[in-house]
Amino acid sequence: MDAVSQVPMEVVLPKHILDIWVIVLIILATIVIMTSLLLCPATAVIIYRMRTHPILSGAV
């Protein structure tokens, strides 16, 4: 007999460290954080320009 055939199934398939839903939540939280880091500075610049240049409020 081979040594591979004598190995129990639990040893061949390791258990996941984290559940699937935890991994999905981490990925979603990362997407939300990265999106806010990209959009918040741009929004702050648009609001600043609209307040400091009221004549050009329509064109940013």
From Swiss-Prot:
Membrane topology: Single-pass membrane protein
Primary localisation category: membrane
Protein name (record): Small integral membrane protein 3
A single GO molecular function term of this UniProt record: identical protein binding
Keyword annotations of the record: Membrane, Transmembrane, Transmembrane helix
Annotated compartments: Membrane
Regions crossing the membrane: 20-40
GO CC field: membrane
Residues at the site labelled Cleavage: 19-20
InterPro entries linked: Smim3
Species in which this protein is naturally found: Homo sapiens
A Pfam match: Smim3
Gene that specifies this protein: SMIM3
Entry keyword Membrane: yes
Induction context: By NGF.
